[in-house]
Amino acid sequence: MRLLVVDDSSTMRRIIKNTLARLDYKDVLEAEDGVVAWKVMAENEDIDVLITDWNMPEMNGLELVKKVRAEAKYEDMPIIMVTTEGGKAEVIVALKAGVNNYIVKPFTPAVLKEKLEDVLG
């Protein structure tokens, strides 16, 4: 299973990647914003799960989610948003855009595990 982690913070990408490795997800790609993520997705069509931050330069996570959902080949791709935007309105906006699950930073490894298992069924 291949995952793509998108966050402008290299520290947060490392935390998520290390957490995923402990959960036995070893095939993890990284991108620092939505523009780079879109390029990574174009070059690696076998990405199974997208984990993205919301607030990033260039193309933010919400814009990335909308772009991903506009492509038929990604319509069923599980997407988890990991962000500091924890208000009810933000969660609703993200879910309407196509996010499958939502994690508010800071979070524990157990939360990431639970949300990932949830989107994977």
Name what the model sees in each region.
Residues 10-29:
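Two-component/phosphorelay signaling modules centered on CheY-like receiver
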Residues 30-49:
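Acidic, metal-coordinating helix/loop segments flanking the phosphotransfer/catalytic sites
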Residues 51-53:
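Active-site T/S-Asp motif of two-component receiver
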Residues 56:
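Receiver (REC) domain active-site loop signature in two-component systems and cognate sites
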Residues 107-116:
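C-terminal output helix
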